[in-house]
Swiss-Prot record:
It is a peripheral membrane protein. It catalyses: Exolytic cleavage of the (1->4)-beta-glycosidic linkage between N-acetylmuramic acid (MurNAc) and N-acetylglucosamine (GlcNAc) residues in peptidoglycan, from either the reducing or the non-reducing ends of the peptidoglycan chains, with concomitant formation of a 1,6-anhydrobond in the MurNAc residue. The keyword Cell wall biogenesis/degradation applies. GO terms for cellular component: cell outer membrane. Residues 265-502 are annotated as: LT domain. Residues 34-264 are annotated as: Non-LT domain. HAMAP family: MltF. It comes from Marinobacter nauticus (strain ATCC 700491 / DSM 11845 / VT8) (Marinobacter aquaeolei). It comes from the Bacteria. The lineage of its organism: Bacteria, Pseudomonadati, Pseudomonadota, Gammaproteobacteria, Pseudomonadales. This is Membrane-bound lytic murein transglycosylase F. In the N-terminal section; belongs to the bacterial solute-binding protein 3 family. Residues 457-502 are annotated as: Disordered. Residues 479-493 have a biased composition (Basic and acidic residues).
Length: 502
């Protein structure tokens, strides 16, 4: 018995020492924020969406991404981005504490309380029901009894619609393989009659889908949030909350919200009156530069001027939050490559734009005849050569001619839909933009040619004839010239909203 007591006391003493060491070690463990600073990396997981994260001219951008980049800079660490297939993957990774922050474009949900912590990011959204214009317009969920409502997987909408007690309620159909653009495209084509989407994603995509109408909201606007694993301590969440408060107070958050949500970037265009005013008042300052550098590059100066107008409205001090700047809106990488030192100098910018367009034009295969080769070059100037090649490959795989702009422009918008861009080499792109970009430059060029020819009408005299340069020219009601066929008849239904080019 005494031996047992002695052994027990000895074991107890050893156990006490071990426990003391464990407790001491636990107390000295670094916090989440300390671990991030020691590693020098902030790990975020996100998905591709125009409201969250995407690449524009080969640069990462997006509202959530820009905030995360600023946050990482403030912490003095590298931002490392992992791109998930969908929200289900983001939530799974966070639940296992395999990332520091999740950028999912979600609002706080009841089922998040015990799994994730959240920090508002200064933008709100609500769940809305949309429908194809040719189906009955619903006013409430009661009008959708026994109808199918389509939505993305792990979205905010299901818990607002599902009612186990109501067997006659709407049928919920979730689509893990789709993104918001793909969902809206199916409503546009009539494949889906009704869908639930986030209002911010509808706002950013609605211009492309004019047959998709908004019916009603399922809830009041709620803050979009960043999500943090519940397994973390408070330090990173507290730092994020303090950061959000600072960027809100200093105006940075408002600037980002205006850029990504206040307008549709390149998809809202000035009307004829403004364009002709700039032709008369701005163009003369730079016309000789356009002529000189266009001649050096072997191109029509009016085409170079049209590119400049589309890029900056001929403003030499134009600056984008992504770092693109100057009259021709050159990236720093492009400027360095072609030997331009000051992008805000009008002459250097025009010279750089002419050089760069000549380089881009030279990459387009010689076998492609004009003017298609120029249209391809313009699209590449806007969206990048890699994305253009992706669209050409998609066109070829569908039995279309990859050397015809009329064929390839059908496939560029598909690069914004997950089911398509995941099959390409260069991934997501806002593929509608180069289509409208080329269209507008052709229109501006056509006007410049007309007013610079002998016996041409004055700029002011053309205003009333240029209704097709109106504010909504990217929308479905933009008329084409009567002498031109409507090429939309040959497009897939979800792409017929793209106005015909001149």
């Amino acid at each position: 018995m005494s031996r047992f007591i002695s052994t027990f006391r000895s074991s107890s003493a050893q156990l006490s020492i071990v426990l003391a060491v464990i407790l001491a070690t636990g107390c000295s463990q670094p916090t989440t924020l300390q671990e991030i600073r020691e590693e020098g990396v902030l790990h975020v997981i996100t998905r591709v969406a125009p409201s969250i994260y995407y690449q524009d001219r080969e640069q990462d951008t997006g509202y959530d991404y820009e905030l995360a980049r600023l946050f990482a800079n403030e912490l003095g660490v590298e931002l490392r981005v992992r791109v998930a297939d969908d929200n289900s993957e983001i939530l799974s990774v966070l639940s296992r504490n395999y990332a520091h922050v999740g950028l999912a474009g979600l609002t706080q949900r009841p089922d998040f309380d015990n799994q994730y912590r959240s920090v508002p990011i200064g933008v709100s959204a609500q769940s809305v029901i949309v429908y194809h214009k040719e189906v009955p317009a619903p006013e409430s969920l009661e009008d959708l009894a026994s109808e199918t409502i389509h939505m993305l997987a792990d979205s905010n909408h299901e818990h607002l619609i599902a009612d186990p007690a109501n067997e006659a309620g709407p049928i919920i159909q979730k689509h893990p393989g789709l993104d918001a653009a793909g969902l809206l495209a199916r409503v546009e084509s009539g494949e889906f009659g009704y869908a639930a989407v986030a209002s911010n994603e509808l706002d950013l995509n609605h211009v492309f889908f004019p047959k998709v109408y908004e019916a009603f909201a399922l809830n009041e606007p709620s803050d979009l949030v960043w999500l943090f694993p519940a397994a973390q301590d408070d330090t990173l969440v507290n730092a994020a909350e303090a950061f959000m408060e600072r960027v809100n107070n200093n105006g940075t958050m408002a600037q980002l919200a205006e850029r990504f949500y206040g307008h549709l970037d390149r998809l809202n265009y000035v009307g004829a009156r403004t364009f002709m005013h700039h032709v008369e008042n701005r163009l003369p300052r730079y016309q000789s530069l356009f002529k000189d550098y266009a001649q050096e590059s072997g191109m029509d100066w009016r085409l170079l001027a049209a590119i400049g107008y589309q890029e900056s409205h001929w403003r030499p001090n134009a600056v984008s939050p992504t770092g693109v700047r100057g009259l021709m809106m050159l990236t720093r990488t492009t400027a360095n490559y072609i030997g331009i030192n000051n992008r805000l100098d009008a002459e250097e910018s025009i010279e750089g734009g002419a050089r760069y367009f000549r380089m881009v034009h030279g990459r387009i295969p010689d076998r492609i005849p004009e003017p298609d080769r120029t249209w391809f070059a313009l699209a590449s100037y806007n969206v990048g050569f890699g994305h253009l090649e992706d669209a050409r490959r998609l066109a070829e795989s569908a039995g279309k001619d990859p050397d015809r702009w009329m064929d390839v422009k059908e496939f560029l918008p598909l690069l914004a839909q997950k089911e398509w861009y995941t099959k390409t080499r260069f991934g997501y792109a806002r593929g509608h933009e180069p289509v409208v970009y080329v269209q507008n430059i052709r229109r501006y060029y056509d006007v410049l040619v007309r007013i610079t020819e002998p016996d041409a009408p004055s700029a002011s005299g053309l205003e009333d004839q240029l209704a097709w340069l109106g504010d909504n020219e990217a929308g479905p009601e933009a008329p084409a010239k009567e002498s031109q066929p409507d090429l939309r008849a040959d497009l897939p239904p979800e792409l017929r909203l793209i106005p015909p080019t001149l």
